[in-house]
Amino acid sequence: MKILGIGNAIVDVICKVKEQFISQNNLSKGNMKLIFNENEFQKLLANLKIEKTVSGGSVANSIVGLSQLKNEVGFIGKISDDDLGNKYEEGLRKENVDFFYTKKKENIPTGTCLILVTPDSERTMCTYLGIAGKISENDV
């Protein structure tokens, strides 16, 4: 392996929404909101229809791009032993990324970014770091 990235392992959850959803939830269209409260995040998610999930996070996205350019790459991140964590791991493996991770059965879910796409294709993001935000030197 020639290139290794360390970052937040975040599953991008893509959902189509109407403009009304953005305003009703006090979101700022086209921006990203960091959500610290899991209940607030789950409340948003409960009202959405998931179109697609993708392994994401800025470092992982860069590593995937480098893999697609035929580089030998790896990524270090932290996921939970849950459905989204499994999807995250599978997504990176499909992109030929060696994934070095700490996978824990904890009450903290895998990090997730809701990507809310309005009819004009504008993206508004709501990110809950979950366990990704708990990565430490012990995980590396």
Task: Map each language-model feature to its residues.
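Short secondary-structure boundary/capping elements
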Residues: 54-61, 84, 106-109, 132-139
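Glycine-rich phosphate/adenosyl-contacting loop at the front of the ribokinase-like
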Residues: 1-76
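Conserved phosphate-binding/catalytic loop of the ribokinase/pfkB sugar-kinase fold
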Residues: 100-105, 115-140
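A glycine-rich helix N-cap at a beta->alpha junction
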Residues: 91-108
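Alpha-helical transmembrane segments within multi-pass membrane transporters and channels
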Residues: 78-80
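Short acidic, glycine/serine/threonine-rich loops at helix termini
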Residues: 14-18, 88, 128
